[in-house]
Amino acid sequence: MKKRLQQLILILFLPFMTFHSLVGQDIIPLPSQVISAPGFFYFSGGTNINADKNIVIPTYLNNYLKQKQATLNSKGVQNDILFSIANNGLSEGYELKITTNKIYLTGNDEKGLFYGMQSLIQLLQHQPLTNGSITLPCQTITDQPRFGYRGIMLDAGRYFQPMSYIKELLDIMAAYKFNTFHWHLTEDQGWRVEIEKYPKLMSKSAWRSETVIGHHNQKPRVYDGEKHGGYYTKADIKEIVAYAAERNITVIPEIEMPGHATAAIAAYPELGCTGKDLEVPRDWGVKEDVYCPSEATFKFLEDVLTEIIPLFPSPYIHIGGDECPKKQWKESALAQSVMKREGLKDEDALQSYFIKRMEAFLKTKGKKLIGWDEILEGGLAPDATVMSWRGIKGGIEAAHLGHDVIMSPNTFCYFDYYQSDAPGEPLAIGGKLTVEKVYSFDPIPDELPAETHKHILGGQGNIWTEYISTLPKLRYMAYTRMLALSEVLWTPVAKKEFLPFAVRLNKHIDYWKTKNIDFANHLFEIKPTLTSREEGLEVTLTPLVPWGEIRYTLDGTMPKSTSAVYVNPLLLTQKTVVKTQSFVQNQPKGNPISIDFLPHKGLQAKILSKTTPSKTYKGAGERGLINGISGSKDQFNDGEWQGITPGETFSMKLSWTDKQAIKGIQFHIYNDPESWIYLPSEATIYTSQDGNIFSKACETKITEDKDTKTLAVDIPCKIKSQFIEIKIPAIGTIPVNRPGSGNQAWLFLDEIRVY
């Protein structure tokens, strides 16, 4: 009992304590191995840095160590830090050995030495300065990365970022051992790179007249009336590439093709299929204007790449390849003539032809091609590397074909998603991606055979910027989840554990706050688990991390330090508003959570059968659609909404112990065409006398409402029955001229109220 109490105290107060013996465990990403030893090294003004002659200490690291009062010295003395390179072992690996009078940092190569320096900096950052020195416990850290590609993508197309923003992002990347910066430089909404041969790309394509305010799906749309844009000169790009290189980061440019090209076509209409004059779009979403596969277009793109390639030493050039609508190609005589000439069976094959031509050109320049997973459509270019974003399916397919893969699935790696269900979260594109879920990501899927693992180069987090226009918001949306991803990509799977990571993460968040850099901190939030029972709704409250205690109210008021402490699950039997929050030492922490329970007849029903939702969007489980809880109005991935697998019709059959006097049924549906989620056109209620044979009782037609994201559909239906069935078919194939056209539409449902 005494031992258990000691463990509990450790868990509760670990985030607020400093344990010298665990100092190596403060590092993010967690090293492969940390072995403690007796004694301490005292880092002070008397500490000298001694490096081999061929080692160049980066300027910024030099400056950091000087701030810590260390002295650069070529002669080894007591209290030294010794830098060396072994030129053996796995690339990027290192050993950091701290003894009582010396610190030995040995890199397997220059990259390994650099990452060892990052670990040393973290050790110094997280130890207090006492009497003019920092005390570091003796230990040996042996470390190397799990994956060779550890990337972050920044979208400069939607919003142009000043150089200072990018440099800060690169600093954070370097500190947490990311080694690749994927720079998304062209988009429908803006062209961001200087091309001397095509000056209108800078004068026209780089600027839009104004920008939509609020979410893209909000209607009517409102605009800010302010011209926005900018581009990076070749000198700017060289400066960023050099800045990144000093931090061991390779910069990969992305020049989008054949889709996401409206900004370029606005400057040079002959590149498109219609020849119409266009403006750079003021709002978001996939646009139908794409490059037409003419020789003039290929000449333009080759000219662009010819100017781009010398700026970037990276072996790769990213050509996009995603979300390319085929409508204009279907209608274009030129595109159809190319298909006939090349013997291409459809527009997917035309896209493949387009990508293969660009890959062949890049090969002549000594570069390799990366594309988003849509480049698989119609046949993959011979040596292309696939960046899998639409889940992991594309990555698995490419690996089976023998192609290299960078895993970047939106469900784990899109940092423009919401981080929490809490009210007051800043506007995001939608969905939800918690730091815990990012941490659970494994770039190597279980279903991938061992012999294909070598093709998984690593992973990448993506910062799409439709809703990220400022540096503070970029920090809030990206940095915390970047730290989780850094450990995914560096640390051995067997060493990963979320709770110890959360302890370290909390310390790092606090450290950066002292530098006036605010990370999001959702570690103190509470996860409610809702279980629908015949007698009501059972609410189980679980903290993300077990620090402090949970307090709650049942009357809709905010919890205080004197509110009830949560001990056991709550059973709600009547209309109730639960509010709950974490408290540490009687102080509220994290965001409060609200649960609005509205009971109805469906809670007492037995589910005879129900369409199984997609594994990705299964909501609150089997009874989640009749649990008395409504989902978010702006997040379809909030844990309540259920996504029906595209192509399926939703059906749910309910039964009661006796006949029920029912007045009608109400359900909520989600409307987000940009995410391929469409409103259904109809819904039908059926009744049965025996639970086997059902007949139509009531139906309703659903009119598309473009002005709302969630729609409540009410079906008045006065019946008395023991058995009912609700059927809601998805619209099927997404029509032409709509986002996702040609694909099967998603249907998302929320609470089905039987009243």
PLM regions and their residue ranges:
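Bacterial Sec-dependent N-terminal signal peptides
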Residues: 1-26
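Contiguous, structured surface segment used for ligand recognition
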Residues: 24-147, 473, 489-499, 503, ...
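Feature activates predominantly on carbohydrate-active enzymes
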Residues: 89-298, 302-316, 357, 361, ...
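Surface-exposed loop/turn motifs at beta-strand-loop junctions within extracellular Ig-like
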Residues: 109, 582-586, 730-732
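Active-site neighborhood of glycoside hydrolase catalytic domains
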Residues: 264-269, 281-282, 287-382, 389-397
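Flexible, acidic glycine-rich loops studded with aromatic residues
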Residues: 368-374, 379-384, 390-538
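Short, compositionally stereotyped local motifs that mark structural "simplifiers"
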Residues: 492, 496-651, 670, 679
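Aromatic, loop-rich ligand-recognition surfaces of beta-strand-rich domains
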Residues: 634-696, 704-755
